[in-house]
Amino acid sequence: MDERDALRISREIAGEVRKAIASMPLRERVKDVGMGKDGTPTKAADRVAEDAALEILRKERVTVVTEESGVLGEGDVFVALDPLDGTFNATRGIPVYSVSLCFSYSDKLKDAFFGYVYNLATGDEYYADSSGAYRNGERIEVSDAEELYCNAIIYYPDRKFPFKRMRIFGSAATELCFFADGSFDCFLDIRPGKMLRIYDAAAGVFIAEKAGGKVTELDGESLGNKKFDMQERLNIVAANEKLHPKLLELIK
């Protein structure tokens, strides 16, 4: 499998998931239909999104790590899949929820070769490969902000930081793409307990890095050794090369 195959598969999945979600009334999306492998309730919207995605991925020689079903398949290519990132938004009609896929030649993020995020509500498509990162087919880069008095997304605003604006959209994959295309200058998820799982963030991290961003753990360590595994959790500090060290110093 190469980048072209991954893009083809991702686009097919995005189309099918979007159709599945669009056909569901909001009152149906919100119903609990079981418990996911991650230990959280599965909404009807999650179930139909994952079913649509897995129907396509089962035709490929891949190992899939996904929120609801866990680890599936035994292929040489690993796929971190979140078929519906931003479930709450999807159940309320808030237009920030995405399908997210990251493809890797091993079970580690450092061997990823393709990332894909598709906003199911707006139709905006983000992907990255060896040539760079793209939004709706156009190259994107992170912002060139140099000062902390900047726009930021932060999940743990208990302390007073000198940011001009803070936003929380409820979809890490989409938010990392907002960082990647320069809409926001930073992305931080510094919640205690490392609430993000690998399938939440892998594609967004890959896209952000290919757009020129620096993305690390709280201690500045690379995310490259994070595994495509249900137990893998992470915090994220993402900014451009100039802002990143300032953010790390600030949140110590």
UniProtKB/Swiss-Prot annotation:
Enzymatic reactions: beta-D-fructose 1,6-bisphosphate + H2O = beta-D-fructose 6-phosphate + phosphate; a myo-inositol phosphate + H2O = myo-inositol + phosphate
Record note on cofactor: Magnesium. Can also use manganese.
Binding site for Mg(2+) 2: D82, D85, D200
Keyword Metal-binding tagged: yes
Positions bound to Mg(2+) 1: E67, D82, L84
GO terms of biological process kind: inositol metabolic process; phosphatidylinositol phosphate biosynthetic process; signal transduction
Listed InterPro entries: Inositol_monophosphatase-like (IPR000760), Inositol_monophosphatase_CS (IPR020550)
Residue positions binding substrate: D85, G86, T87, R167, A172, R191
Domain of life: Archaea
CC cofactor: Mg(2+); Mn(2+)
Signal peptide coordinates: none
Keyword terms: Carbohydrate metabolism, Hydrolase, Magnesium, Manganese, Metal-binding
Residues the record lists as binding Mg(2+) 3: D38, T40, E67
Regulation of catalytic or functional activity: Both FBPase and IMPase activities are inhibited by Ca(2+). In contrast to mammalian I-1-P phosphatases, is only very weakly inhibited by Li(+) (with an IC(50) of about 290 mM).
EC number: 3.1.3.11, 3.1.3.25
Gene3D superfamilies membership: 3.40.190.80, Fructose-1,6-Bisphosphatase, subunit A, domain 1 (3.30.540.10)
GO MF annotation list: fructose 1,6-bisphosphate 1-phosphatase activity; inositol monophosphate 1-phosphatase activity; metal ion binding
Assembly and binders: Homodimer.
Stated family: Belongs to the inositol monophosphatase superfamily. FBPase class 4 family.
General function of this protein: Phosphatase with broad specificity; it can dephosphorylate fructose 1,6-bisphosphate, both D and L isomers of inositol-1-phosphate (I-1-P), 2'-AMP, pNPP, inositol-2-phosphate, beta-glycerol phosphate, and alpha-D-glucose-1-phosphate. Cannot hydrolyze glucose-6-phosphate and fructose-6-phosphate. May be involved in the biosynthesis of a unique osmolyte, di-myo-inositol 1,1-phosphate.
Protein name stated in the entry: Fructose-1,6-bisphosphatase/inositol-1-monophosphatase
Organism name: Archaeoglobus fulgidus (strain ATCC 49558 / DSM 4304 / JCM 9628 / NBRC 100126 / VC-16)
